[in-house]
Every structure is written in structure tokens, then in C-alpha cells.
Swiss-Prot record:
It comes from Mus musculus (Mouse). PROSITE patterns: TRYPSIN_HIS. This is Inactive serine protease 35. It holds the Pfam family Trypsin. One of its GO terms (molecular function) is serine-type endopeptidase activity.
Length: 409
């Protein structure tokens, strides 16, 4: 089962090319110049009450069909939605207004694009296709070790040595910050030794593993692939006991104003993302951000993500699935998932321009099982928020503090 999972992860892009219907050029990261989101001014706001329930979206949200009926937003509306709140660990809160530069506005919203299969509903479809990552050879290596757990019950993804990308509703319900988010923590999965103890912090082995994280994928293939008919001398190396988390406090949280609504405003699902800044840097390898391509540019039309589903007893759970429909800002997809996995970073594996290497990048955030408005009727779907060029520019600004490092994506 372990080797099967490894080959699934490695060979999925190859499956997409095997029928000859798609070319290698289709599966390359195409970097292009993106608009800039620039901070204009910052004002202080009153401290929140932290009384919202974690992970609960209390209203029907505007989904793909609903968005098709709306006019394209103006530049001022985009700047309003991309302005953002920052909440600090001491409870203080600020609002930063932004300006968008270098954007060419579209006259109308793009219509949705459907995938190859009819859309289905519910969180888990028929046979559960999720994989629990129990072996430390996988769980502690890239890309699985980029998945983290939030103390509010959601998941997230490491996108820099100091930052975690997650869903906005994991820390804010649209009106107030959730209970426990004032002392928000992020847990990085650590595996126990055979004796049930965690590795000693600061050990030489831990430092070597952190320093060699960039080579982990190649090492993983080499150390786990066996020749047919040859038994492993080491035997199965399945984790002993329960997983353990190394917890780090969150220093600050950024949320787009498009998610923060007043008493009369509805929730804008396309802004359901947030960035957490950690109080201290982690030693894990992180996953870079990328601009979400269209369905036709996805190898096999598939996406991937890992998170900590509540029904798997804090196990790290991986899945991949097809995208059924997309709009400018949202994806409807088939991935089996349960509560706890929301906030996970959805990633693709495409080739670097002009190279033979495949590279994974985060292109969307899993918003979860949501009730969406479909022509006036409420329906439930598994939804993800795409990282558009503007959102890439905004998240990049949050990470780097300026737009200088965010010109291409």
C-alpha cells in the first residue's frame, strides 16, 4: 500500500499524458507579469470580541452560478475587497487600504467552465478514496510535510518559513473572529520513534533532515522503491503510536476585506483565504504559490491536497480528484474530504519552464463543503478558492511586506 501511494503521487502527471490528447507544453508553469497590490494607508480598529464559532459558515454563499449573474467588479470595488485586516496576538486590529496597479479590467465576468464529468454533491462520494499517510517516510517528507493543523480545527499549508495559508472562515466567520483565534497556534506534524518518544529537539539528525529537505523527494523515491521479488531488509516502518504536533503561536493574521462583511453583507466565498504569520520560523520545507491555471491546463484535470480530516483521528490525509467546474475565482471538485481538512492548500505538479523537473505549487485553498446559491436554490458542493493573479499579488505582499518580489506569478 505504501509503494502504491508513492507511485500514485509520482506517476499521476504521466497518466495525463499517456493518451496523447495533451501535449507536454500544456503542463508547464507559465510565469507572466501580474498586477501589483500596494499598501496605501493603515488605520487602527477596535479589538474584536472573538465570539464566532470556528469553521462554521452561517450563510448561503454566492457560488459559481450566482457569480455569473453579477457584473464584473470595478477597480474601486476590487481595491475595497483586497484591502485587508490584520489581527495581532495581543488582540489589536488594523485595516490596510490598498491600490491596484497594472490591472487590465475585463468588461464582463467569465462564464464558468465545466470539467469532463457531471458534478456530484456531498463531502465523500461512494467509496472513500482518501489515503492516510501513516508512514513517516511519507509524512515527514515533501509535499506531505507542508500540511499543518490549526488549533481552531482546520488545516493549512506552509508557504514560507514563517507563513501558513489557510481559509478565512477558519479564523473569522465574516462578522467576528472565532473563539480561540486570539491565541491561535499552528501544529507541524512530528512522528514518534519506535519507543513512542518524539525526536529530541535540536538533534543532529533533525538538523540534517531540515537542511536536506530540498532533496527529500529524490531520496524518498530511492529509499522506498524495491526491485520485484526482493524483500526489504528493514521491514515496514510504520509510525508507532499517535502522531504528535509541534505547536507554534501565530504572531499575526491577514484577512481580505472581501471576506469581512457588515450586518447586511453576504459572504464572498471567493475571498475565503487568510495568511498566518508564525511567531518563529519552522524547519519544514514549504510549498510555493502559483497562479491557478484553467481546467484544460491541469494534468488529467486533477488537483491534490492533504489535511487533517476530523474522522481520521488526527492522521494526515492525502487525496487527489478531478475538477468538475470553474469560474474566475472558484473550483467545484470531487475530492473526498471531511471537516478539519478545510483550509488545505490545493496544489498542482507541473514542469518548470525549459526544464525537465516537475514542481508543485499551491493554486487554490480548500474552502470545504459549502451551501451555495444556484439560481435561487441552495445546493451543497465541495468548493475551492482559486489563487488569481490579484490574489497572488495580495498574498505575496503579505509574505514579503512589499510588491517588489511579486512581479511575476
Amino acid at each position: 500500500m505504501e509503494n502504491t501511494l508513492l507511485w500514485l503521487v509520482i506517476l499521476i502527471p504521466g497518466w495525463a499524458l499517456s493518451d496523447g490528447s495533451e501535449t507536454e507544453l500544456d503542463f508547464t508553469w507559465h510565469l507572466s507579469r501580474i498586477p501589483q497590490v500596494v499598501s496605501e494607508n493603515t488605520i487602527h480598529l477596535a479589538s474584536p470580541t472573538f465570539q464566532a464559532d470556528a469553521g462554521v459558515v452561517k450563510a448561503t454563499v454566492c457560488g459559481i452560478e450566482c457569480q455569473e449573474e453579477l457584473p464584473a467588479p470595478s477597480l474601486s470595488q476590487l481595491e475595497e475587497s483586497l484591502s485587508y485586516e490584520t489581527i495581532f496576538e495581543n488582540g489589536t486590529r488594523t485595516l490596510t487600504r490598498v491600490k491596484v496597479q497594472g490591472l487590465v479590467l475585463e468588461p464582463t465576468r467569465n462564464s464558468s467552465v465545466k470539467g469532463a464529468h457531471p458534478r456530484r454533491r456531498r463531502q465523500v462520494y461512494g467509496t472513500d478514496s482518501r489515503f492516510s499517510i501513516l508512514d513517516k517516510r511519507f509524512a515527514t517528507n515533501f509535499p506531505f510535510n507542508t500540511a499543518v493543523k490549526l488549533s481552531t480545527g482546520c488545516s493549512g499549508t506552509l508557504v514560507s518559513p514563517n507563513h501558513v495559508l489557510t481559509a478565512a472562515h477558519c479564523v473569522h466567520d465574516g462578522k467576528d473572529y472565532v473563539k480561540g483565534s486570539k491565541k491561535l497556534r499552528v501544529g507541524v506534524l512530528k512522528m514518534r520513534n519506535k519507543g513512542g518518544r518524539k525526536k529530541r529537539r535540536g538533534s543532529k539528525r533533525s538538523r540534517r533532515e531540515a537542511e536536506s529537505a530540498g532533496q527529500s523527494q529524490a531520496h524518498l523515491r530511492e529509499s522506498t522503491t524495491q526491485r520485484p521479488g526482493k524483500k526489504s531488509r528493514r521491514g515496514p516502518r510504520v509510525t508507532q503510536g499517535r502522531p504528535s504536533f509541534q505547536w507554534t503561536r501565530v504572531k499575526s493574521t491577514h484577512i481580505p476585506k472581501g471576506w469581512v462583511r457588515g450586518e447586511n453583507g453576504g459572504l464572498a466565498l471567493d475571498y475565503d483565504y487568510a495568511l498566518l504569520e508564525l511567531k518563529r520560523a519552522h524547519k519544514q520545507q514549504h510549498m510555493e504559490l502559483g497562479v491557478s491555471p484553467t481546467i484544460t491546463k491541469l494534468p488529467g484535470g486533477r488537483i491534490h491536497f492533504s489535511g487533517f480530516d476530523n474522522d481520521r483521528d488526527e492522521q494526515l490525509v492525502y487525496r487527489f480528484c478531478s475538477v468538475s467546474e470553474e469560474s474566475n475565482d472558484l473550483l467545484y471538485q470531487y475530492c473526498d474530504a471531511e471537516a478539519g481538512s478545510t483550509g488545505s492548500g490545493i496544489y498542482l505538479r507541473l514542469k518548470e519552464p525549459g526544464q525537465k523537473n516537475w514542481k508543485r505549487k499551491i493554486v487554490a485553498v480548500y474552502s470545504g463543503h459549502q451551501w451555495v446559491d444556484v439560481h435561487g436554490v441552495q445546493k451543497d458542493y465541495n468548493v475551492a478558492v482559486r489563487i488569481t493573479p490579484l490574489k497572488y499579488a495580495q498574498i505575496c505582499l503579505w509574505i514579503h511586506g512589499n510588491a517588489a518580489n511579486c512581479a511575476y506569478g
